[in-house]
Design a protein with these regions (language model features):
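Substrate-binding/active-site clefts of carbohydrate-active enzymes
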Residues: 145-323, 332-352, 358, 369
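Carbohydrate-binding surface patches
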Residues: 20-36, 563-602
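Conserved, mostly hydrophobic/aromatic
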Residues: 30, 84, 142, 196, ...
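The feature marks proteins involved in alpha-glucan
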Residues: 1-23, 27, 55, 63-168
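Conserved alpha/beta catalytic core and glycan-binding cleft of carbohydrate-active enzymes
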Residues: 114, 345-346, 350-351, 355-505, ...
Length: 641
């Protein structure tokens, strides 16, 4: 199906696709304009392998309008499982899970009629999004299973690695009552948002078995259904919904926003449920009719086609409204077209409080794709047409600080290549000078980071450059490099982002792509987090985050000028974030050298907020005037007295 043929299909602008439940009746609606007939098959269970599995009958849907087939069944069909059977004019048939399914049985093979009110945890009606000002925002990325799977996490065994692992608020290491873990730890770290790697239903983990495997989840199956392997009961579809909401509510009670990692750039299979409902419509193709694979791991969704765009917007709104999600991170955002991303931003903005919902993504692709109809990819080159409240991950900041992620031994500013100071200077002001050919209009568009789930952890990267092989040793040189790296991006303008455990030297022992596990490699090591040397690193992160929150001009969130850069010798960097309040002036210095370095100070009396090892909002140490000595491999922040 080419672009013209796709655009000739009827567009449905309703908001009622899917199974719409009331105790008196359920209405099924499916957009399938090329089908000749559609039947809904009803089942007692999500799979035929479960006790009491049996077929409850089949019912024909009727053609309604604009490509939609519809059926209203009287009676209470709550928790009934269903599947669509489609017949096409050329004789082909297909079985498909409802693309608008709200929940499903084990492994997502059948959708389930859901009573959303009955699938609400206690107190859900009172759940509110935390209000977090732009300058105080920071993101901590974690996989649901990684968060609490550690046997030492203090989380009850039945909740470990599950949505419910986020709910207990008082967990400690082995229950010792002293060393906080999981949510109890997060409450005091100082980050504002938790970004969850994919929590929608994905393909490659067998939900029916406790040992069904591990995956990061970038293999989407049912976009509006929570992943069943994170539920304590994957066989009853209402459980995953209730427990996912309970997780969000627990994070909100702790004052934390929830960002959802979404994968609307591709489907895992070429015969996805979407493709089965309207063959040839949903995915991009080359002129030879082969599906494009710009993600490198699936079949690209054609976001520029009208009903694909609608589907993505509808899905985002569903998660925002039904699960109170506070932000969305788009995997391979450059595989979406810019108009679709702007439509998402506009739709979120129209929600109550929606302008505070974060929206950002990866401004790159994993291969070649084939945009149609003049669509532009949502990459850095499209910043002139993208909303300035759609952010993007800045790989230039990342690589300048620690070295190129695709070359394990390549060094950056903090670990042996201080000449990258030129790029670090641009990072400070969020690259708004167009130095690399892209022009952010606001600092808040730039996600400043040095590690994420992809590639080596920060600790492992520093170890690789330094040719260390003992990833568990609290190497003093690596700790200093880690602190400087964090000190840089946490004093850059933009939105700071970190991988969970970066703040305690998280290691995967050199595994740069642990997407299939094992869990032992990926899970957070809460014992390591409380080893004294790594706990001190965490304390440094906590202090730097506090400095950032209290010195709003460092963040430069929206409408802020770029910092005033000081002229210093060699590869030293110093700058002053502009402040209208003379009582709220700080100066920041980076020293990548392995020796002490003297610097001249701006006029005034200054005291330290950080000396490169300790950090916090209370000034400490002597008063400095005229000049001071910077410690080796360090970040120094001074406040004007």
């Amino acid at each position: 199906m080419n672009w013209q043929q796709a655009c000739e299909l009827p567009y449905y602008n309703g908001t009622d696709l899917g199974a719409n439940y009331t105790p008196a009746a359920t209405t099924f609606k499916l957009w399938a304009p090329t089908a000749a007939a559609v039947t809904v098959e009803l089942f007692a269970t999500g799979t035929d392998a479960e006790p009491n599995a049996h077929h409850l009958g089949a019912h024909h849907l009727q053609w309604e309008r604009d490509g939609v087939w519809s059926l209203t069944l009287s009676g209470d069909w709550k928790n009934t499982y269903y599947l669509y059977h489609l017949q096409f004019h050329d004789g082909r048939t297909a079985d498909a899970v409802d693309p608008y399914a709200r929940t499903a049985g084990a492994n997502g093979r059948r959708a389930m009629v859901l009573d959303l009110d009955a699938a609400a945890p206690e107190g859900w009606a009172e759940d509110k999004r935390p209000v977090i000002p732009p300058h105080a925002r920071s993101v901590w990325e974690v996989h649901v299973a990684d968060f609490s799977a550690d046997e030492h996490s203090g989380v009850p065994a039945e909740y470990r690695g599950k949505f419910m692992g986020f709910v207990p608020g008082d967990t400690t290491l082995d229950g010792d009552g002293v060393h906080p873990t999981c949510l109890n730890y997060l409450k005091d770290l100082g980050v504002s948002h938790v970004q969850l790697q994919p929590i929608f239903d994905y393909e490659t983990v067998d939900e029916s078995r406790p040992d069904g495997g591990y995956n990061w989840g970038y293999d989407p199956k049912n976009y509006n259904v929570p992943e069943g392997s994170f539920a304590t009961d994957p066989f009853h579809g209402e459980v995953r919904v209730r427990e996912c909401r309970a997780m969000v509510a627990a994070l909100h009670r702790a004052g934390l926003g929830v960002v959802m990692d979404v994968v609307y750039n591709h489907t895992y299979h070429s015969d996805s449920n979407l493709e089965r409902t309207v063959p040839g419509y949903w995915n991009r193709r080359w002129p030879n009719d082969q599906m494009t694979n710009g993600s490198g791991c699936g079949c690209d969704l054609a976001s520029e086609r009208p009903m694909v765009r609608k589907y993505i917007v509808d899905s985002i709104l569903y998660w925002a409204q039904t699960y109170h999600i506070d932000g969305f991170r788009f995997d391979l955002m450059a595989l979406e077209d810019a108009d679709t991303m702007n439509a998402i931003r506009a739709a979120l903005d129209a929600l109550p409080g929606g302008q505070d919902i974060l929206l950002y993504g990866e401004p790159w692709q994993g291969g070649s794709t084939n945009f149609e109809g003049g669509a532009r990819p949502a990459d850095k080159r499209a910043l002139d047409v993208l909303s300035d409240r759609i952010g993007f991950f800045c790989d230039d900041t990342r690589d300048s600080i620690k070295g190129n992620v695709f070359d394990a031994g390549n060094a950056g500013y903090v670990n042996g290549a201080p000449q990258h100071g030129h790029e670090v200077l641009h990072s400070i002001g969020a690259w708004r000078g167009g130095q690399h050919g892209y022009w952010p209009r606001q600092a808040g568009q730039v996600v400043q980071y040095i590690s994420a789930h992809d590639n080596l952890t920060l600790w492992d990267k520093l170890a690789a450059v330094g040719r260390r092989r003992d990833y568990d040793a609290p190497d003093a040189e690596l700790l200093a490099q880690n602190r400087l790296a964090a000190g840089i991006y946490l004093t850059c303008q933009g939105l700071p982002f970190m991988q969970a455990g970066e703040e305690w030297g998280r290691t995967k022992h050199g595994d740069h792509n642990s997407y299939q596990g094992p869990l032992e490699t990926n899970k957070l090591d809460w014992t390591r987090a409380h080893r004294p040397e790594f706990a001190a690193l965490t304390a440094f992160y906590r202090g730097m985050l506090a400095i950032r929150r209290t010195c709003a001009r460092i963040a430069g969130a929206y409408g802020e000028p770029q910092p005033f850069v000081l002229a210093l010798q060699g590869w030293l960097i110093g700058f002053i974030p502009e402040s209208p309040d003379p009582k709220d002036v700080v100066v920041v210095y980076y020293n990548p050298e392995r020796t002490h370095q003297w610097v001249s100070l701006p006029i005034g009396s200054w005291r330290k907020l950080t000396d490169g090892v300790h950090a916090g909002t209370t000034p400490f140490g002597p008063i400095y005037r005229d000049a001071m000595e910077l410690p080796p491999v360090s970040v120094t922040v001074l406040r004007l007295e």
